[in-house]
């Protein structure tokens, strides 16, 4: 096995992931560092998703590097801003691969990750830890993609089970009008169909906007018990406020991609009763070993 393959295997072990060493991938960096490429939103309405993910990753890698890195090589993240726009993400991906990053890491979102998919697949560059649960990145299987999150199908199935167990069976869906939102809608619809139910209403919002009036006008008259939101924090917060102002008295459930802290910050006191599902351990439960490491 060549040195490049050995390096990738050491890197993946350092992250606690499956080995990346078997691929003939982008050129490894010099002996002193491993450079990961991240395209994510660092500006615009979804900026906090990219900013917070990057800060968390840097916190881990700073600790890893202080302990000697991976095979005595430090790990660095090279970031590029895509504003949560697929075309910009695709261009960033081409540039990062041209710059010979070791792997792509921490991409934010479904439409952006799907834009990068054919590019990194053709280049045979690993795609590690995307912040998305889209089924389109899981089926068909792609040996270059390494997931660390549950799928949206799994997440929405548990949301629907929770709601119906509480007797809340009239469920509406507010979703982003792109691959992410449609993946979440499909998950909710499938979970309801398994119970011989269907959404009482659905409505959309465009990506990177907060124009929710049409969605409120469509969903509130359907009188749902709950609204499952498949959007980013800005649009979700706008919908919560507008729906309540229009007289909706039900509950709101969000998938984890919404950005829990960002949504809480956006809503402030209006966040009471808004639920966000989680697919990773809570950082606020010190009984867990991984949480103690984080703290």
Feature locations, PLM:
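Loop/turn elements at helix/coil->beta-strand transitions in domains of secreted/extracellular proteins
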Residues: 73-75, 99-103, 123-126, 141-143, ...
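Periplasmic-binding protein-like
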Residues: 96, 100-108, 128-130, 172-175, ...
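Extracellular/periplasmic periplasmic-binding protein-like sensory domains
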Residues: 240-295
């Amino acid at each position: 096995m060549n040195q490049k393959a050995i390096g990738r295997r050491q890197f993946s072990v350092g992250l606690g992931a499956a080995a990346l060493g078997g691929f003939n991938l982008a050129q490894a960096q010099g002996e002193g560092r491993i450079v990961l490429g991240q395209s994510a939103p660092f500006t615009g309405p979804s900026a906090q998703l990219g900013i917070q993910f990057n800060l968390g990753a840097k916190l881990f890698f700073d600790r890893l590097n202080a302990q000697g890195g991976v095979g005595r090589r430090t790990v660095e993240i090279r970031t590029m801003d895509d504003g949560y726009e697929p075309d910009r993400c695709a261009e960033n991906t081409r540039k990062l691969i041209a710059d010979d990053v070791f792997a792509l890491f921490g991409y934010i979102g479904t439409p952006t990750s799907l834009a990068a998919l054919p590019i990194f697949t053709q280049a045979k560059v690993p795609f590690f830890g995307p912040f998305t649960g889209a089924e389109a990145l899981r089926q068909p299987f792609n040996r270059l993609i390494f997931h660390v999150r549950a799928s949206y199908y799994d997440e929405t199935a548990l949301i629907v089970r929770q709601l119906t167990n509480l007797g809340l069976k009239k469920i509406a869906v507010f979703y982003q009008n792109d691959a992410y939102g449609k993946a979440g809608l499909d998950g909710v619809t499938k979970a309801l169909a398994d119970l011989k139910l269907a959404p009482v209403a659905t409505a959309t919002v465009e990506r990177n906007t907060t124009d929710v009036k049409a969605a409120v006008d469509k969903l509130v008259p359907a009188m749902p018990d709950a609204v499952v939101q498949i959007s980013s924090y800005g649009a979700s917060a706008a919908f919560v406020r507008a729906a309540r102002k229009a007289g909706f008295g039900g509950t709101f459930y969000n998938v984890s991609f919404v950005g829990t802290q960002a949504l809480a910050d956006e809503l402030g006191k209006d966040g009471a009763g808004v639920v966000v599902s989680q697919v990773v351990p809570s950082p606020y439960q010190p009984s867990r070993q991984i949480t103690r490491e984080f703290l």
